[in-house]
């Protein structure tokens, strides 16, 4: 098959390179030699483009003083090391005397000519795009061919940042911490396994909401939560006023082992779902109406009376419902001791479930992750994107803060 005819630009470059190799007696033996030549070519092209940028900035070319219409001028060069796919190379960056010149070809704080592309790839990964989608996107928009391994290599740069974030120093006290787990599938030693991502969202005493931590483990267990809570304590957390959790067996005991004074609120919505999932369609509506009288009661005393009434009415058909509520009452009823504003904040884990739903949207194209690291990378990047919108605090936080200061006065004074 005949070689495709070169474009005029490529033909000129081919001739130039041929003359360069011949006149300098350059022998290309392996990839190392190719990289060396490419570095030289790239540095010449970049330096020429940078000089041209400064010409346009000043409005006159070098030595063309007759057309100079500015009090600014050239001021030599500074050297910069650029990391490229062909290895490190030194280039000369032109300077102006006033320091106004902001080069665009190689920006001031850019240390890699692929940095912008890497940022684009990381951003696409954060939006939940698969490696195949990213490859296609880069090919169509930028005419760049990249592989799965290249995407992984670029996004792997996030992992040290994630580790540093997981181990960062924390504040001594948090008003409320919501804790829950979300489940995914990942490959491990050639098998597809279920993974639990443990998530904690904090509300600071000033009312700001943020993600306290995310950790990948095996199926959700109180033992793993215990290790996370110990880690939080080692990072500086001395007290959590109220912890809002699901109904995982052993979870309250794990919290009490690390933060013995923490008030524990078990999620009412989780409890409703877990105890009514086997109720018949015909009876679910009246049963839920009776159950609402329990959790929506104005006081704990009224709630207990309504629970007894519910037990009498429904335990013939559904004996486990009232029993479960009574067995877990100590942690289900915590919110009754607080005023309405605090109750609304803590009686469900909707805060963290909303966050989990947003993570699901990002990861919906991934049925199985290649590894635990790839799962953590995507969730961390998605978290950064999601929490950008978390600004300010709740409108009623002033009222909530005042109430918490009264209820937890002694504990807060000790911190």
Please identify what each model-predicted range represents.
Residues 1-29, 33-76, 81-86:
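Subset of Sec-pathway N-terminal targeting signals
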Residues 3, 260, 293-415:
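Acidic/histidine-rich catalytic cores and adjacent linkers
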Residues 61-70, 129-176:
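Electropositive nucleic-acid engagement tracts
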Residues 69-127, 143-156:
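Basic, short loop/linker segments at the boundary and entry of helix-turn-helix/winged-helix-like folds
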Residues 94-97, 105-109, 144, 157-245, ...:
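RNase H-like nuclease fold core
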Residues 102, 275-303, 309:
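Metal-dependent DNA phosphodiester-chemistry modules and their immediately adjacent helices/loops
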Residues 242-249, 254-290:
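Conserved beta-strand -> loop -> alpha-helix junction used to position metal-binding or nucleic-acid-contacting
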């Amino acid at each position: 098959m005949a070689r495709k005819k070169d474009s005029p630009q490529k033909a000129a470059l081919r001739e130039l390179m041929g003359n360069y190799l011949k006149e300098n007696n350059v022998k290309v033996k392996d990839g190392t030699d190719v990289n060396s030549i490419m570095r030289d070519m790239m540095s010449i092209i970049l330096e020429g483009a940078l000089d041209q940028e400064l010409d346009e900035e000043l409005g006159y070319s070098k030595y063309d003083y007759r057309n100079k219409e500015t009090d600014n001028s050239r001021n030599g060069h500074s050297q910069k090391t650029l990391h490229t796919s062909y290895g490190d190379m030194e280039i000369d960056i032109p300077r102006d005397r006033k320091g106004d010149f902001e080069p665009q070809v190689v920006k001031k704080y850019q240390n890699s000519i692929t940095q912008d592309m890497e940022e684009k790839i990381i951003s696409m990964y954060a939006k939940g795009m698969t490696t195949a989608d990213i490859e296609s996107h880069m090919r169509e928009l930028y005419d760049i061919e990249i592989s799965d391994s290249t995407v992984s290599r670029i996004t792997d740069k996030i992992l040290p940042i994630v580790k540093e974030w997981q181990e960062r120093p924390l504040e001594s006290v948090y008003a409320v911490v919501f804790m829950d787990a979300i489940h995914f599938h990942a490959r491990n030693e050639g098998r597809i396994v279920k993974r639990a991502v443990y998530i904690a969202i904090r509300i600071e005493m000033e009312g700001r909401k943020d993600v306290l931590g995310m950790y990948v483990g095996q199926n959700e267990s109180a033992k793993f939560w215990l290790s996370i809570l110990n880690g939080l304590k080692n990072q500086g957390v001395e007290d959590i006023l109220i912890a809002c959790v699901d109904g995982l067996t052993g979870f309250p005991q794990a919290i009490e082992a690390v933060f013995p004074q923490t008030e524990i609120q078990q999620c009412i919505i989780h409890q409703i779902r877990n105890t009514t999932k086997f109720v018949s369609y015909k009876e679910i509506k009246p049963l839920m109406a009776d159950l609402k009288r329990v959790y929506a009661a104005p006081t704990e005393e009224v709630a207990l009376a309504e629970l007894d009434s519910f037990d009498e009415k429904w335990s013939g058909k559904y004996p486990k419902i009232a029993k479960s509520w009574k067995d877990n009452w100590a942690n289900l009823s915590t919110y009754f001791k607080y005023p309405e504003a605090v109750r609304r904040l803590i009686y469900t884990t909707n805060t963290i479930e909303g966050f989990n739903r947003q993570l699901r949207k990002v990861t919906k194209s991934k049925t199985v992750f290649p590894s635990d690291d790839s799962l953590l990378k995507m969730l961390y990047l998605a978290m950064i994107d999601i929490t950008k919108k978390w600004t300010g605090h709740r409108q009623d936080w002033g009222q909530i803060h005042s109430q918490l200061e009264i209820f937890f006065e002694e504990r807060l004074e000790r911190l």
